[in-house]
Swiss-Prot record:
Protein family (similarity comment): Belongs to the pantothenate synthetase family.
Compartmental location: Cytoplasm
Example GO BP: pantothenate biosynthetic process
Signal sequence bounds: none
CDD domains referenced in this protein's UniProt entry, alphabetically: PanC
Top-level EC class: ligase
SUPFAM superfamilies linked to this entry: Nucleotidylyl transferase
Keywords recorded for this protein, A-Z: ATP-binding, Cytoplasm, Ligase, Nucleotide-binding, Pantothenate biosynthesis
Catalyzed reactions per annotation: (R)-pantoate + beta-alanine + ATP = (R)-pantothenate + AMP + diphosphate + H(+)
Binding site for beta-alanine: Q62
Name of protein: Pantothenate synthetase
């Protein structure tokens, strides 16, 4: 039976007991409102550890001034049930007061320069500072041997890898493949905001990513690939934040050849969707 913890001392006691037994612990950080993509992170975490701890915390420091923290769906009972079915051993459910004892406005914040300041960082200033701040605290609280993050949030994964390397956290960071519906739409908590009419239109993001890959393989210029992708999304009714081709390190490519990642962020109505494709 899955264990739930609301108090840090009790969680640390259980983790210490596991570690005395020589067991490896993996962490799966989440903000709740979980779906099959999140459950796949737990399944993957089991390959890297003997015990899996998931955290559920809607983090106020990663919400911008125009992003409604209070409206983010909170479904803890369903989330815990789903995590148990996925094979999770424990769930950490901290309060805002426990995570930020000095208050959100006065808390010490983390910043990962460079990679956190482009793309999502440019569209959502301060977002990755909030992500780094909460993830660093979760690492210190849980002290996992491994932590699993979805590749759907490609830039977030890159930011966390940079923070872990620079601060020498002794934690293995694992990226989990994107989980998609049968029509290609990446699973996301935001998909529930799409109307019945918008839902089939949203699949054009994945088709556009595939088109960007085809353009790259065919030798098209980066400028042409990005322009065509933006035009295709706009034709389907999207407001495009970015549709870009980058190196795996999220730098602008300066030469042909090598791996690439295509990244898209676009708004359909009021719903902002992100996706990416590595090739």
């Amino acid at each position: 039976m899955i264990q739930t913890f609301n108090e840090l001392g009790a969680l640390r006691g259980q983790i210490a007991e596991w570690k005395r037994e020589g067991l490896r612990v993996a962490l799966v950080p989440t903000m709740g409102n979980l779906h099959g993509g999140h459950h796949s992170l737990v399944t993957l975490a089991r390959q890297y550890a003997d015990k899996v701890v998931a955290s559920i915390f809607v983090n106020p420091t990663q919400f911008g001034p125009n992003e409604d923290f209070s409206r983010y769906p909170r479904t803890p009972e369903a989330d815990v049930a789903g995590l148990e079915q996925a094979g999770c051993d424990a769930v950490w459910l901290p309060s805002v007061e426990a995570m930020y004892p000095l208050g959100v406005d006065k808390t010490t914040r983390m910043h990962a320069p460079g990679v956190s300041e482009v793309l999502e960082g440019a569209s959502r200033p301060g977002h990755f500072d909030g992500v780094c701040t909460v993830v660093a605290r979760l690492f210190l609280q849980v002290q996992p041997d491994a932590a699993v993050f979805g590749r759907k949030d490609y830039q977030q994964l890159a930011v966390i890898k940079q923070m872990v390397a620079e601060l020498s956290f002794p934690i293995q960071i694992v990226g989990a493949d994107i989980v998609r519906d049968d029509d290609g739409l990446a699973k996301s908590s935001r998909n529930q905001y799409l109307s019945a009419e918008q839902r089939p239109v949203a699949t054009s993001i994945h088709r556009t990513l595939l088109g960007m890959r085809e353009g790259y393989v065919a030798g098209q210029s980066r400028a042409q690939i990005e322009a065509d992708a933006t035009a295709a999304l706009q034709a389907d009714g999207f407001q495009v934040d970015y549709a870009v081709l980058r190196t795996p390190e999220l730098a602008e490519p300066t030469f042909d050849g090598g791996g690439r990642v295509a990244l898209i962020a676009a708004r359909l109505g009021t719903t902002r969707l992100i996706d990416n494709l590595e090739f």
